[in-house]
């Protein structure tokens, strides 16, 4: 990141509320099929980021994804069912892929997901997160469902 022109003040940058279809995992009956659907969504997100970066240019610094873009909301599943099928592990492959996208495109990438915690088995949290341009997860805000 470049130094601000005026010390103590941020330079201008572009932010994007990325509009992309959410392919919810509610039709999937198990984690394996839900994971495949999430992987396909991650590929679409990557393609959209590539296009946005080319269109907007290097001033694009912040991209915000749609709400629950990887899974959509639960549609009648119990808490344990949704936790098993759709909630992401904090160190799971979906977060690794999101971190890689932030790094590849040099943006702060913000979004939210359902997230598990090993200290609360069978439950999940609604988690909002931000990855920085180096791929580090720099912010997580969680709340109970």
Give names to the regions the model predicted.
Residues 1-145:
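Hydrophobic structural segments
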